[in-house]
Amino acid sequence: MNGVMEAAADIRPKSGDGSSYLDAAFGIGARLLRSAVWHGNICNWFGPVFEEHAGSHQLACGTLGPGLYDGTAGIALFLGYLGRELADPAFKRVAHAAIGHALARAKDIPEGIKYGFYTGEVGIGYAAIEVGRCLEDPTLVTRGFELVRTAAEADLDGNAVIDVMSGSAGVIPVLLRLFADSGEGWLMDAARRRGDILLARASRDERGLSWDVLGELAGTMDLSRLSERLADIKAGDRSRPNLIGFSHGAGGIAWALLELGAASSEARMQDAARDAFAYEDSWFDAANDRWPDLRLHDAGNDVTSPGPIAWCHGAVGIGLARMRAWRITADERYRGDAVAALRMTARSLLNGSPASANYSLCHGLAGDAELFLTWAELTGDAEARALVDTVAARGIQDVVREHRPWPSGIDGAPESPGLMLGLAGTGYFYLRAARPVRIPSVLLVGPESKPRPAGTAYG
């Protein structure tokens, strides 16, 4: 790893320029303010959306939904933090209007993903709580907690999605974070119920513990809405192995179970987390130094696709989960996995084409940089922080100074307003790069952790 870092010396800024990062966040925030569409005291944005046409989902332009991932709740979260950090009433006003839209339209979310974090009501409620705190608006905080409680205590019956993106695995750590803040017992009770759902839906084989996330999702929604290459997956289809990775795979679910086990002292949750991490470990390709993309894998065939580097699928999300696992357990195996993820991601960053890469949190440079920012917070590692500054400086040089649109995480859409795929997420990255202690990660939302002693190196 050190050799890779030395090769980056010629493109690495000498130090993080916090003022320019705030300027970049301000510029993105100002663009969102100018493009907001108002209706009374709430607002929305036009952006890329997928609409059904002739039996398939095609990219179109339309108003955004209410969710955290790609809707008004996510934009509100960014603008709320930005308004607080800059003490700017204009950003605060639009943050309030955006979260007002999200709260009003939460009822429109499809049933299959309604109770999740990134796509559902728990995420909207969480954003309302955070925006309310930024704006010192106790009414918003109360409304946020009420929505989280409604979603957390809903009767999921047979419609429980299980992954981090839309299901119980994403909700559990958020409930635990809110429990740590408030001490409200219903939050822990709801987290335990969600944990029981995860254990009940798990599959065990010689590799470890895993979940048929795509099959579960196919039973609740048309997967072509996520990707055309997933359109042929049906509920109960066992022709593909269960996924690894963070947003839809075993690693993200393992992280949720580990957080629950640590908070509740339930050994069965901790044991299940260990077995789920073991499943993910079993797929690691040591010869090629990668985790494969099992979305592209059919049973009986070799995995030949390059290993992905992203939060949603790949080394970034896997690394974030292992960093947190190391923090909770002090197990050096998890540290080793985190180092592997750092190595792969650094290699991708330094060998890639930053001018054409997108700056999304989900599967872009902003998300890649979060892996190094989290590691720097955890260990005090200066090299990791330097890579964050490299990514940030590239964006300022290639996009801001060249007056280009920020590349989004949606193919065919040069710019998008949302949090995980677009402008709000890019702005969030710059705000967090400038104020990492004050701005929490939105890619690993769970109970707070304390940094390890400064100077802990990797590689």
Question: In which residue ranges do the predicted regions lie?
Answer:
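Glycan-recognition and catalytic cores of secretory/periplasmic carbohydrate-active enzymes
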Residues: M1-G459
